[in-house]
Amino acid sequence: MTSAVDPHALRATMRADLGVAMKARNSRAISALRTAITAIDNAESVDSTVATAPASAHIAGATIGLGTAEVPRRSLSPAQVHAILRAQIDDRSAEADRYETLGQIEAAEGLRGEAQIIAAYL
């Protein structure tokens, strides 16, 4: 992925490819894409440990209505998305090596295949 690639466009492409993989019943691609998209989504999440002002009643200061619990997600740069995908690839490669040393060749090949699928988005 180059610095000119929009993270939102990349995620949209990955989601579209996930739909294609689901229709084709390609379990390896489904697994790789779901975890990569989830990793990006998790990185965009906001810190939930932000303290709220203390209140004396159960609902003091509470707001009600549609969307009151929503906050804007963090915006990731292309470099951050690249690092997230690179970490996904590195994790799969390391686990594939570990599985291979344990004699589980098929599992190692599956993880390497997932790493290749994610690498196509870099």
Language-model regions, residue ranges each:
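Charged, compositionally biased, marginally structured helical/coil segments
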Residues: M1-L122
